[in-house]
Every structure is written in C-alpha cells, then in structure tokens.
Amino acid sequence: FFDNKESSLLTSSKEVVSKLLVSSESSKDLFEANIAQDSMNEFKLLELMQGLDLGQIFKVYKAIDKSKQDGKKMIPRVLSDGHVIPKRGIKFSRKSFYNDVPVIFGTNRDETKLFNAIESDYSTSLFNRLIVVRNQEMYDLTAEYASNNWKISAVDNPSRDMINSGKKDVFAYRFDWDEQGKLLWMDFSKIFGAAHAMEIPFVTGTMKLLGIERFMFNDENLPDAIRLSIAMQSYWAEFAYTGDPGKGRDNNLPRWNTWSSSGEKFLILDSQNDQGIVMSDFELRRIDEFKRLFADSRIKKDDTKCKFLNNLVQNAYEKDAISFYNEKCLQGE
C-alpha cells in the first residue's frame, strides 16, 4: 500500500482494490479497506471482483486517468501477474530465472518518436498523414527521456542482471541511424530519427518498411544506409551461426563485444556519415535518469517534470526510482 514504509505506487493494484472496496461500500474508508483486503485469500478476492458492477470499476480508473493528466498518478504498465510476467518481476539476477543461451538486447536511440509523431503534447497529425511538431525542443526532450527509459528496461537492466549472475554471452546494441529526408516542412530526421522499427529494413536488407521507405531513403543517403544494412545482416548471421556476432560473417567489421561491467557495453549502429559502428561504455540507471530529469534546466516547471516522470515511472520497478517519484511528485496527495 502507498502509505506503507516500503515504497509503492499510489495506483498499484492493491490501492485500486481498496478504492473499489470503498466505492462499493464494502468498507467505509481506505484504512478499513486495506485491512479487509489483507485478510482475503485469492479466491475471496476473485469473488469480490467478479461481483462488482462494471460502472464501479470504470469509476475508479476514470478518476485515476483524470488525475494522470496533471502528472500526479498513473496505472503501472508492467504487472507481475505470475503468468505472463513472474511474480518476482522482470529479473535476471539468477541463472535459474532464464534460459541460458546467447542473447542480444537492443533498442533504437529515439524509440518513442514513432509514437510521439502521431500525437503528443508537442506534435499533432493532420489527416493522419502530415505531421506538425509545435515545439521541437520539448518534442526531442520527451523522446530523449522516454527512449532512455525504454532502454533501461529492455537493455541495460537485463544485461547487468545477467552479467552479474555469471552469464558471459550477453550482447547489446543501440540503433542510431537518423538520416531520413524531407517533405514539405517535415524533416523526418528530426520527426522520426532513430525511432521504433526504423532498424527493420536494415536487418532484413529489403530497405522497405510499409511504404515509409519513400521518406527514409533517397539517392543521397541510400548508399551509406545499404552499407550499414550489410554490416547489420552480417552481425546477425554470425550470431545465428555461432552465438557471437564477433566481427560479422566475413570477419571484417568492428568487434561486437559482450556487455562488460567495467568496460564496453553496447554496439552503436550508425552510418559512416555520423559516428559509424562503434562500441560504447555508457550505461543508464533509472534513478540517475529521474534525478537528471528533475535537474534539467531545459524543462522549466516542476509540474512539467512530474508529467514526464509520471509517464516514465509506469515502467519502473526499482524502489529507489519509485521513492524519488513519490517524494517529488506525490507529496500531499
């Protein structure tokens, strides 16, 4: 529960159930509801939930969604339900928690720009075709923090956990290619950049992506893009053959090393027009990103920072990051 000493979320499943108990008049207040819920086994809880009116359930979630607009509360996206995700959560700290096979983790540098381009606080879509970015700096900032947050969950945390558990063959990458062309006022290198799914035509080698390739590739950038694609296919093929991408099938690429606790961690995949293919020793931690965001002078207002954090914490399970969010954004709630 949120008022326990151990950090929790104001809209955790237990908090929601307690609100439902009060809403259905099964308990007179949240304190009584918390006690009642703790005394229930899973079958009693199931019976209670199945007996609730649908309107009561929607009422609680609508109230949460309304306050979410103020950057105050949220519903977690990652649920340790014991079926899809183990009750222990997304953890790889022991070898018994995963299948011990060679693994590649990877994300794109600007993952969330694909979704932000469709609709966000700083952009809009006209006629489902034309994209208008109203504030490029804030648009980029939103993507920067959200994409880093994605990388923490999908790459850095599992890589660290597996390496710390004794696993050796953990590889990671970040796709950075962002050389798309322009159409009218739309600069797709800024609107999309290295967004979600942009790596697909490079991995497959088709240089096609549901028609989007018309705006991705042109006579100027295609030759270098193809060279990057050939390199990526070579790495992927070598990994499939041997479990180690190494220097690719022809042994002529920069070596893709495993994640190292004290050294290089992931491979940056970019064209020679930019930084090329190179290893990086940079890593991300959720609490550090949350603190960096709250100290970021580019974001002027604390309530805007809390709106950012509100979205980021929905994918967080680290207690220190959740505590930081609660302290900065939920005081007085």
What are these regions (language model features)?
Residues E32-I226, Y235, T242, L330-G332:
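Substrate-gating cap/lid region and adjacent catalytic-acid/histidine neighborhood
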Residues F2-D3, K59, N128, D140, ...:
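Compositionally biased, low-structure terminal segments
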Residues L20-K44, G51, E289-N310, A316:
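Charged, glycine/proline-rich intrinsically disordered loops and linkers
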Residues F1-E6, K19:
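Primarily recognizes the serine-hydrolase "nucleophile elbow" in alpha/beta-hydrolase
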Residues H83-V84, I163-V170, D178, G211-E333:
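Alpha/beta-hydrolase-fold serine-hydrolase catalytic core, especially in secreted/extracellular enzymes
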